[in-house]
C-alpha cells in the first residue's frame, strides 16, 4: 500500500518536467501537481482522520483505496491541465483516508512503543521502494513513447488488488474504539495538544526539506534546460552525468535502505540522539550543496536520503504513541495534515522564489536549506530537554502493559 502510494507521489519531479512541456506552464503552475495533491492529503488527514477511529480501520482503508483507484483510472480521460489538477487533488483526499487508517492499524498490532517505531520504519521503507520504482517507471514509459499518465493507471491496478486483499483479511479490533468512538471535534482538539503539535511541526519542516529534493533537484542539476543534448554537459565525466540523470532514484534508494536499517537502529539506540545526528547531516548536505553548486550537490543531495530515512517514520511513530490507541487515527490525521502542508508549501514556495529570480532553482534551495536548519534546531531542543520522555513512558504502561521509566 505504501509502495503503491509512493509510486505516484514521489514521481512528481519527473512528471513536472513533462507537464511543463505538454501544457506550457510555468514552474509555479507546474508545482500545483504536487501542491494540490498534498493539500488534498492535508484536508483529508485533518477532517477525515477520525474515520479510522469511529468506523474502524478496515472500512476506512477500503474507502480510501477505492477513491484512489477511481482517481487513477480517470487520468486516462484527462486532456486539460485543470482536469488533471482536479484528479491530483482527489487522489490526495483518498490517500489521507487510507493512510490514517493504515497508521492507526500499526498501533493495533504493536506490543510496545519501541516495536511501533520499528514497524513504522518498515512500512515507510516500502514507501521508499515505491519512490524508487515510480520515477524509473515514468522515465521508462516516456522513452518507450508511452504517456506519463499510464503511471496512474498502473497504480490504480495495484490499488484494486489491495482492495481485494483488504476485504479478505481479518483486522484486530480495538476495544477502546467501540467504547469511546472519536468524533471530528475530538480530532480538531488535538491541534491544541503540545505533543501532537510538536511532532506535527517537526514533520512539516522535515517534509518541506525532503520534498525539495525529489521535486526540484532534477531542475537544479540541469546544466542547460533549453537543449536536450547539453542538459548535463557541464559535468566532468560520464559517470557524474549519469548520477545527475538518476539523482532522484539514488536519493530514494538510499532513503529506502536507511529505513530498513532503521528498523534495527531504533531498537538499539536512543531515538532523540539518532534524529539529532541525522538532522545535522541533512543540514550539512543542503548547505554545502547550495554553496558549492550542482557540481557537488549532485553527490550531496542524493546522499541526504540516507540521513532522511528514519526521521519521518520516527516522528510519526512517537507522535502517535503519545496518545491512546482509540485516538491513533485522529492524531495520525493531524500529523498527516502538517506533513502534507509541508510537502505542499515547501516546493510551491521554492517555485515562487525561483520564478522571482529568473527561474533558477538554486534560489528555491535557499528556502529548503532554511527548513533543514530549523529542523536541526528543533531536534537539538528535543535531545536536550526530552519533552516526551514521561508521556511515552505513561502510554507504554497504560496501552501496552510495559512498565518502563523511559521510552526509546
Task: Give the positions of each predicted feature.
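Extracytoplasmic
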Residues: 1-21, 25, 99, 103, ...
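Residue-level signature of mid-helix packing/kink "hotspots" within the transmembrane helices
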Residues: 10, 38-46, 132, 252-260, ...
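Extracytoplasmic gate region of multi-pass secondary transporters
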Residues: 12-13, 194-249, 256
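Helix-breaking motifs and short loop linkers at transmembrane-helix boundaries and internal kinks
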Residues: 24, 56, 77-82, 270, ...
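Conserved MFS/SLC helix-loop-helix module at the cytosolic interface between two early adjacent transmembrane helices
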Residues: 43-82
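Helix-loop-helix hairpin linking two adjacent transmembrane segments in secondary transporters
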Residues: 83, 122-170
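Cytoplasmic helix-loop-helix junction between adjacent transmembrane helices
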Residues: 87-126
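Symmetry-related core transmembrane helices of the 12-TM Major Facilitator Superfamily/SLC fold
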Residues: 149-167, 363-382
Amino acid at each position: 500500500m505504501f509502495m503503491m502510494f509512493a509510486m505516484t507521489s514521489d514521481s512528481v519531479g519527473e512528471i513536472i518536467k513533462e507537464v511543463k512541456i505538454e501544457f506550457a506552464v510555468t514552474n509555479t503552475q507546474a508545482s500545483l501537481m504536487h501542491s494540490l495533491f498534498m493539500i488534498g492529503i492535508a484536508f483529508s488527514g485533518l477532517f477525515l482522520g477520525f474515520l479510522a477511529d469511529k468506523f474502524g480501520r478496515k472500512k476506512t482503508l477500503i474507502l480510501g483505496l477505492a477513491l484512489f483507484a477511481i482517481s487513477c483510472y480517470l487520468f486516462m480521460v484527462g486532456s486539460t491541465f485543470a482536469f488533471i489538477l482536479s484528479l491530483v487533488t482527489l487522489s490526495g483526499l483518498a490517500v489521507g483516508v487510507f493512510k490514517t487508517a493504515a497508521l492507526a492499524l500499526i498501533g493495533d498490532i504493536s506490543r510496545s512503543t519501541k516495536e511501533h517505531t520499528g514497524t513504522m520504519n518498515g512500512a515507510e521503507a516500502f514507501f521508499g521502494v515505491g519512490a524508487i520504482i515510480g520515477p524509473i517507471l515514468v522515465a521508462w514509459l516516456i522513452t518507450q513513447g508511452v504517456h506519463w499518465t499510464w503511471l496512474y493507471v498502473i497504480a490504480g491496478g495495484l490499488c484494486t488488488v489491495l482492495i481485494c486483499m483488504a476485504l479478505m483479511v481479518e483486522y484486530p479490533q480495538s476495544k477502546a474504539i467501540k467504547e469511546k468512538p472519536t468524533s471530528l471535534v475530538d480530532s480538531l482538539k488535538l491541534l491544541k495538544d503540545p505533543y501532537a503539535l510538536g511532532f506535527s511541526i517537526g514533520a512539516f519542516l522535515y517534509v518541506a526539506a525532503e520534498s525539495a529534493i525529489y521535486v526540484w533537484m532534477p531542475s537544479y542539476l540541469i546544466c542547460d534546460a533549453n537543449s536536450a543534448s547539453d542538459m548535463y554537459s557541464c559535468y566532468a565525466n560520464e559517470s557524474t552525468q549519469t548520477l545527475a540523470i538518476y539523482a532522484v532514484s539514488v536519493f530514494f534508494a538510499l532513503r529506502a535502505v536507511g529505513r530498513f536499517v532503521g528498523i534495527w537502529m531504533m531498537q538499539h539506540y536512543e531515538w532523540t540522539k539518532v534524529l539529532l545526528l541525522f538532522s545535522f547531516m541533512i543540514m550539512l548536505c543542503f548547505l554545502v550543496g547550495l554553496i558549492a553548486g550542482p557540481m557537488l550537490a549532485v553527490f550531496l543531495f542524493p546522499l541526504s536520503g540516507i540521513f532522511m530515512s528514519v526521521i519521518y517514520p520516527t516522528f510519526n511513530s512517537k507522535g502517535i504513541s503519545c496518545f491512546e490507541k482509540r485516538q491513533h487515527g485522529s492524531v495520525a490525521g493531524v500529523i498527516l495534515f502538517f506533513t502534507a502542508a509541508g510537502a505542499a508549501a515547501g516546493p510551491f514556495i521554492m517555485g515562487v522564489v525561483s520564478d522571482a529570480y529568473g527561474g533558477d532553482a538554486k534560489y528555491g534551495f535557499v528556502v529548503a536549506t532554511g527548513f533543514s536548519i530549523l529542523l536541526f534546531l528543533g531536534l537539538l531542543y528535543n535531545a536536550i530537554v526530552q519533552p516526551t520522555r514521561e508521556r511515552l513512558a505513561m502510554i507504554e504502561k497504560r496501552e501496552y502493559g510495559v512498565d518502563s521509566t523511559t521510552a526509546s
